[in-house]
Amino acid sequence: MRRQLSRSVLGMATATFAILACTTAAGPAAAADAPYDVLVFSKTAGFRHDSIAVGTQAIRELGAANSFTVTATEDAATFTTANLSRYEAVVFLNTTGDVLNPTQEAAFESYIRAGGGYVGVHSAADTEYGWSFYGNLVGAYFASHPAIQQANVKVENRAHPATAHLPQTWTRTDEWYNYQTNARSTARVLATLDESSYSGGGMGADHPHAWCKAYVGGRAFYTGGGHTQASYAEPAFRSHLLGGIRYAAGRAKADCRPETGYTTLYNGSTSGWSQAGPGSFSNSDATLTSVGGMGLFWYSAKQFTNYSLKLDWRMPGDDNSGVFIGFPPSSDPWSAVNNGYEIQIDATDAVDRTTGAVYTFKSADIAARDAALNPPGEWNTYELLVEGERLQVFLNGVKINDFTNTDPVRSLAGHIGIQNHGTGDDVSFRNIRIKELGGTQPPPTGGTGPIRGLAGKCLDVRNAATADGTQIQIYTCNGSGAQTWTVTSGGGPVRALGKCLDVSGGGSADGTKIQLWSCNGTGAQNWAAQADGTLRNAQSGKCLDVSGNNSADGTVVHLWSCTGAANQKWTLP
């Protein structure tokens, strides 16, 4: 019968998770699944694959080894609301044509809406063309295929349980489908076909082959593989099927939201990264694994302000690590601790120091976190969504924390990095990617407080002096009067210590000094916040700029042609 999953994944003893051998080195053992039930449906009303029998047997064997019971049928009459409720997942195994009548379709729709799972294998995409619900569920309909041949499958998501065991390039022989539409807009693509590796591809550079999605309350996984009998004897393909079934049945969690527009920071290459402090990270199979510490592997090539950062992580047991954001460049890992924020990875610490917490600042929603978390030994995916000084944390696609920074000494803008906590705290990371959101926030309407810029540093009157001509700089935020500015709503003077932010001599040349000066109402003291985060002097049309893109304390600010770069972005009160 359909069984409800009630166990917590935190603090569980590790047990052997039996799957047939994979093509890459085995990772740490994962917890055994609570028992569940799977319906395998293989009715055909068109072409019939000779691999259906061996495919059904393979799924039975996977079930026997991995905590699920299989019922196999080609009788569409089993599609009733009462009967389907017995199963956590339904596999459409090489179905073809119109296999369900309207009453049966309605029962299956109700099953999915109630949280059921769907797995489509190969010609499941050549099924039910006239049923729009099914078309949206499967993700794309079959269009054509060339002859059976060898091809390279490019695995772009190696956190999902269906693909985590696979290498970045998976070479195998099968019948390779072209589809009528690209599934990427509605599903998370897990793997694509490299059309340069075989003949007859018809979708170009982006040819999805396997994907997953959440759909109207349920879960769906589809793979284009599985035409040949030999497929079901391949250990890697069997594990691929198993992972898809586990996801559809709700036994493994994954972020299956559509994903586009991200830039890779790490997927095997460490270019642009630097190690701060002791310890290191090993780099093998496009996977970083922490060694020793306490140190920090940080992306030193660029700082970020408004962005979505995604990464995949796995810990083998009760381990400790975290993702740091919003810190200035430094070879000292404690700079990130003292100036930025850590989103924690730790199975068993206190609630404000465990997985999903903004370390010591705000606990995750523990119930939501536990429901979304895969246990030690399995991969998880974080999204850290930073918009101004607001941070939202998503675990496997589920929001588990929402935090707003109000500390004038810290900021969410700056560098990002991953922690190597110490010997024995072994956490691995994959596929670190980022999407910069740009000027998504409207300009402020005026207020009093700090003006934060590059690396979260504050606009500062040097030495808190009040003499006309005092240099303006950036400095670590400290809440002093030298960093307390009053911004005029809609544009105008920006004041601190009773005087105004001023362009020296009313100049317009790049590099003109920015200083403190007695307020005089001239254009040299007229500043307007822009939607892209810059602060523009209206008279010159140029921007307040941190010299040399240098975030060190004491770096001067000057006037410069507006570029929208990070050293011209300011968060105003």
What annotation goes with each model-predicted range?
Residues 441-466, 481-509, 523-551, 566-573:
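Extracellular glycan-recognition/adhesion modules and their associated mucin-like linkers
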Residues 1-32:
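Secretory targeting and sorting signals
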Residues 321-331, 470-476, 512-518, 556-561:
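Aromatic-rich beta-strand patches that line glycan-recognition/binding surfaces
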Residues 92, 97-166:
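A glycine-rich, often tryptophan-bearing local segment used as a flexible ligand/cofactor-contacting loop or short
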Residues 140-217:
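Catalytic beta-strand/loop cores that center a nucleophilic Ser/Cys/Thr
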Residues 32-36, 42, 50-53, 57, ...:
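Extracellular ligand-binding/catalytic regions of CAZymes and related secreted enzymes
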Residues 30-35, 249-264, 436-450, 490, ...:
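Low-complexity, Pro/Thr/Ser/Gly/Ala-rich linker/spacer regions in secreted
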Residues 257-441:
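Carbohydrate-interacting regions of secretory-pathway proteins
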